[in-house]
């Protein structure tokens, strides 16, 4: 019975990391489409939009990195 709990812990950590990666991919895709839409509407604002795009993309991409760290911590500290 004890092995079942560890198996569920590993599965939960894997699901947590996978869903975070999928969510970030969807978020960056939407962010990129909105950036291109804004750049097409107002080409003179491209430098400002690009700066904001990379800042927000870094924040969106940080969430899966934090989740991977937490998932690995949960997987390896529970043993």
Swiss-Prot record:
Source superkingdom: Bacteria
Cell compartments where the protein resides: Cell inner membrane
InterPro entries named among the record's database cross-references: ATP_synth_csu_bac/chlpt, ATP_synth_F0_csu, ATP_synth_F0_csu_DDCD_BS, ATP_synth_F0_csu_sf, ATPase_proteolipid_c-like_dom, F/V-ATP_Csub_sf
Pfam family, one: ATP-synt_C
Major place of residence: membrane
Membrane topology: Multi-pass membrane protein
Keywords tagged on the record: ATP synthesis, Cell inner membrane, Cell membrane, CF(0), Hydrogen ion transport, Ion transport, Lipid-binding, Membrane, Transmembrane, Transmembrane helix, Transport
Membrane-spanning intervals of the chain: 11-31, 53-73
Quaternary structure note: F-type ATPases have 2 components, F(1) - the catalytic core - and F(0) - the membrane proton channel. F(1) has five subunits: alpha(3), beta(3), gamma(1), delta(1), epsilon(1). F(0) has three main subunits: a(1), b(2) and c(10-14). The alpha and beta chains form an alternating ring which encloses part of the gamma chain. F(1) is attached to F(0) by a central stalk formed by the gamma and epsilon chains, while a peripheral stalk is formed by the delta and b chains.
Protein name: ATP synthase subunit c
Organism annotation: Blochmanniella pennsylvanica (strain BPEN)
Gene: atpE
């Amino acid at each position: 019975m004890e092995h079942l709990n560890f198996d569920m812990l590993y599965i939960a950590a894997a699901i947590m990391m996978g869903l975070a990666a999928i969510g970030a991919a969807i978020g960056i895709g939407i962010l990129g489409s909105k950036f291109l839409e804004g750049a097409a509407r107002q080409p003179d604002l491209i430098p400002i939009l690009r700066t904001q795009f990379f800042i927000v993309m870094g924040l969106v991409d940080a969430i899966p990195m934090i989740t991977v760290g937490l998932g690995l911590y949960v997987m390896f500290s529970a043993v």
